[in-house]
């Protein structure tokens, strides 16, 4: 089985349950159904994107995020919204490639990047619509920072944040050029497991607290709505 490019969300799903990852992202046997929370998050991201990119007025329900966006707009530099980035491994080195390149190894989409090449830095912002930052994971920021260093070779420092707009909380992380790919060493064991699963074509179920009520893979015996 050919290895497919992975993303932060895809690897997170594989870490939770390889079978769920396979059925949803590889076999695609489960139709994607947007929950109300997902719909809200997508609408919020879209509103923020067009406010930043085109100065389009925010819908009334998202007016509360304007102070955050205005502060970001005051930062000097070139802005990129919903920027798709990817990398490939060629000659044992990480290299830039097109997002849809068949040889892509890792993909990521950044909500907002502001580059200030004169100061060799970039600002990275990922908007979150959750109610709390209590379980925030900065791995996503580290992965996006690695992509930024490849796609913007003049950047030597990435200052990033998870911006929880509803909770009014910010989780910050800073990355430097010399340790730009450290995140892949941190994820090495999970990435080896992912490759082994593709090589063998075996994606085993991993029973967890989400199986009974929240998993969409109803053909799994651990699902609360299991059906053959």
What is the predicted role of each segment?
Residues 1-228:
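RecB-family 4Fe-4S metal-dependent nuclease core
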């Amino acid at each position: 089985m050919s290895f497919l490019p992975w993303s932060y969300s895809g690897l997170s799903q594989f870490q939770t349950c390889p079978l769920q990852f396979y059925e949803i992202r590889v076999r695609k046997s489960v139709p994607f159904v947007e929950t109300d929370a997902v719909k809200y998050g997508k609408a919020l991201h879209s509103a923020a994107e067009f406010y930043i990119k085109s100065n389009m007025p925010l819908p009334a329900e998202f007016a509360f995020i304007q102070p955050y966006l205005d502060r970001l707009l005051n930062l000097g530099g070139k802005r990129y919204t919903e920027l798709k980035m990817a990398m490939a491994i060629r000659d044992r080195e990480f290299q830039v490639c097109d997002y849809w390149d068949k040889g892509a190894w890792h993909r990521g989409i950044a909500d907002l990047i502001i580059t200030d090449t004169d100061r060799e830095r970039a600002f990275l912002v990922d908007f979150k619509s959750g109610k709390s930052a209590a379980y925030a994971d900065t791995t996503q920021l580290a992965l996006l920072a690695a992509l930024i260093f490849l796609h913007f070779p003049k950047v030597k420092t990435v200052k990033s944040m998870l911006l929880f707009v509803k909770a009014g909380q910010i989780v910050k992380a800073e990355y430097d050029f010399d340790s730009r790919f450290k995140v892949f060493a941190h994820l090495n064991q999970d990435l080896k497991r992912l490759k082994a699963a593709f090589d063998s074509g075996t994606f085993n179920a991993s029973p967890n607290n989400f199986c009974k009520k929240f998993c969409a893979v109803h053909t799994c015996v651990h699902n609360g709505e299991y059906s053959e």
